Amino acid sequence: MRFLRRFFQLESSSGILLLIFAMLAMSLANSSLKSHYFNFLDIPIVMQFGTFAIDKSLLHWVNDGLMAIFFVLVGMEVKREMLEGALASYRQAVFPALAAVGGMVVPALIYVLITRSYAELSNGWAIPMATDIAFALGVVALLGARVPLPLKVFLLALAIIDDLGAIVVIALFFSEQLSVPALTIAAFSIFGLLVLNRMKVGHLCGYLLFGGILWASVLKSGVHATLAGVIIGFSIPLKDRRGNRLLHAFEHTLAPWCSFLILPLFAFANAGVSLGSINVASVFSPLPMGIALGLLLGKPLGVFGFCFLAVKLRLAKLPEGVDFKQILAVAVLCGIGFTMSMFLSSLAFGGESTSTINTLSRLGILLGSGLSAVIGYLLLRAFTKPAEN
């Protein structure tokens, strides 16, 4: 028990847990238990209330349900940083914002250039845009006090803006044919959340009620359900009517569940890549190469390039105590797409988890993310000094 308590208190524990669950999924997907693993993910689960029903496989419940809860946390984090954190002013936000834009645009361009001759792969351009903040911060935490605090804050702010970009991409490009009745119910739910926000209600029950209705209606509307999570997160007031820091309290409560349950389960459900049908030629085919190079080369080129230009053009300043070599190391770590890239892959290509296109997409994510983690760690270790006692 003491060991477990100490483990969960480590900064790197969430990243380690993600890696363990991803490796477990890979092991099962390439063992004699392969069919049981994929059949387990395809188990149908039905939620019914009168004539209203949601019939999804376990995999879809993880991707549409549990990840919506994760995006509630994302919404709260973004709101807090915009109100009183690293994004609270133009001067604070401009440097990580430009870095995030570069880190989204360049990987997408590299993917498009590599896959431009294959129309069936065109939907995957957003996959290498993402950064898995839990994994990236987990790698940074392995170096402990060697890493300057301003550099950690820069990475966190960059990743939060990256999440905002992912939210916009999901809303604009991965919504299906829209249902007006479902959107109408969603609008009423949002109104209810706004009323709770304006009244600074401090009880969780109202947010859960309207949030649950919002999630179900958005799921049925054709807009991806994770957007409901973001809206719920933004609806939580910074303080309740008594002055209690409500947003911080909810965020503090939800964060461990996301780090130690939801994201590991997502990794377990999505990282299982069966390598039986994959050969050397397929590894170097356009889809995995477009994703892997987008993450491994596009992310550092975009993040570092935009940072360098921003400083040289005097649009922004380097964080205090941080140099360009350290920015380069963090830029490489931003290539750890992992869970967020897999999530965008599931939206881009859908279909069965065992389909060839999904297998190759996940292979590219694992290659790009894994190499980015190793190279980023080595660079950051080389470019930082041991902390003085």
Swiss-Prot record:
Compartmental location: Cell inner membrane
Keyword Amino-acid biosynthesis: no
Catalysed conversion reaction: Na(+)(in) + 2 H(+)(out) = Na(+)(out) + 2 H(+)(in)
Record NCBIfam families: NhaA, PRK09560.1, PRK09561.1
GO molecular function: sodium:proton antiporter activity
InterPro entries in the cross-refs: Na/H_antiporter_dom_sf, NhaA
GO biological process: regulation of pH
UniProt family annotation: Belongs to the NhaA Na(+)/H(+) (TC 2.A.33) antiporter family.
Domain of life: Bacteria
Membrane topology term: Multi-pass membrane protein
Protein name: Na(+)/H(+) antiporter NhaA
Function statement: Na(+)/H(+) antiporter that extrudes sodium in exchange for external protons.
Source species: Actinobacillus succinogenes (strain ATCC 55618 / DSM 22257 / CCUG 43843 / 130Z)
The entry's keywords: Antiport, Cell inner membrane, Cell membrane, Ion transport, Membrane, Sodium, Sodium transport, Transmembrane, Transmembrane helix, Transport
GO cellular component labels: plasma membrane
First and last residue of the signal peptide: none
Disulfide bonds: none
Keyword RNA-binding: no
Transmembrane portions of the chain: 7-27, 58-78, 94-114, 125-145, 154-174, 176-196, 199-219, 260-280, 291-311, 327-347, 363-383
HAMAP family in the record: NhaA
